[in-house]
């Protein structure tokens, strides 16, 4: 094998969404790709019915799939969501559209189905995928890694370039931390989450809009529901693990000791949602309570030998629906740098320099978005700011672009979207202060401030 051939070998740990996408992109460009996954092949039916985990696919992720030639196949399995349907007790559900029309929507996609499409795509491009083999250790000096199966049998492999796409609890990240200081900073969240289910029959009985992301805001806690193709919905309850010290009586998972306690909680706090959850007691007891955290790293790579991407590099909370989209965007950027750079060390350094600021930005915006989803969506002040923002977007479409639109419907770098969003937020807050409706607001004066503070964007990529 020549030195050039050797330089185009890659070993990927983790056959989730980011790992399979980067495998397909590199294999299509002639790289020799070996992908290792500790779990069994999800495409092989075992008879066990897993949980239905849904993700929100936005333009960043859709663009990545488009480049990989898989967008059409994925969207055929997805459900369009035109906006947030906000449920507040005592008022009719209120649809808050995401964008101007059906060109600005997001898509609900089952994670398992998306993973299967990407696995097929990686194999079709020539990648070799090895299941039931988890990473145990990495010897960077010898460029060898050790894998093992469920029986404890160990296998040693040589690697030239190692990509860690193995999620929040990354074994590659752990191995890298033994040879370089990754600058890890973990920020745990007081909230956990629990996944529940609305059946197709229940969604039909209660006339639940199928083309929307549903939100039941409740301040310190909330429920969301994403649609499935069969008109069922995957519901997620976000709630504190423990009651805050200052509010010892506030609801938390620790108080919900079983399914019956969960039912009583839903009957009190989500009275319109509770009747839709036919299997609440069983779902609550059988589905684990998930943990949420944000992990920030200052270092993503070890020279030209190893690099992290997706959740392995930047775990984030799910409140902006961008974790998957950011990971798929990572995969595209990494493949492009590896294809164009003179050597792997240059490629990994350039990839890190490009993506780190954006990862930090979307991590911050995801944390901020919890407040918007759980509280602001039902606030009159927020709704007035949103209405004024829509008017400014119509008057100055190249200058005032709602932050949600920049994040969700464009590929403008997250860091730029965040910076512009902060300026826009301050403009709106100042403009609506002491006003209860638009009639008393000087729209021309607000527009003047928009043109003064926000340079035009010639195009949104």
Swiss-Prot record:
UniProt-listed GO biological process terms: anthranilate metabolic process; kynurenine metabolic process; L-tryptophan catabolic process; NAD biosynthetic process; NAD metabolic process; quinolinate biosynthetic process
EC number: 1.14.13.9
Effect of residue 404 to A: Abolishes kynurenine 3-monooxygenase activity
MF terms in GO: FAD binding; kynurenine 3-monooxygenase activity; NAD(P)H oxidase H2O2-forming activity
Functional pH dependence: Optimum pH is 8.5.
Cofactor(s) listed: FAD
Positions that bind FAD: 17-18, 37-39, 56, 111, 135, 311, 324-325
Chemical reaction(s) catalysed: L-kynurenine + NADPH + O2 + H(+) = 3-hydroxy-L-kynurenine + NADP(+) + H2O
Residues involved in L-kynurenine binding: 84, 98, 369, 404
Annotated metabolic or biological route of this protein: Cofactor biosynthesis; NAD(+) biosynthesis; quinolinate from L-kynurenine: step 1/3; Siderophore biosynthesis; quinolobactin biosynthesis
Keywords: FAD, Flavoprotein, Monooxygenase, NADP, Oxidoreductase, Pyridine nucleotide biosynthesis
Family: Belongs to the aromatic-ring hydroxylase family. KMO subfamily.
Function as written in the Swiss-Prot or TrEMBL entry: Catalyzes the hydroxylation of L-kynurenine (L-Kyn) to form 3-hydroxy-L-kynurenine (L-3OHKyn). Probably required for the synthesis of quinolinic acid and the siderophore quinolobactin.
Protein name per its UniProtKB record: Kynurenine 3-monooxygenase
UniProt organism field: Pseudomonas fluorescens
Gene (UniProt): kmo
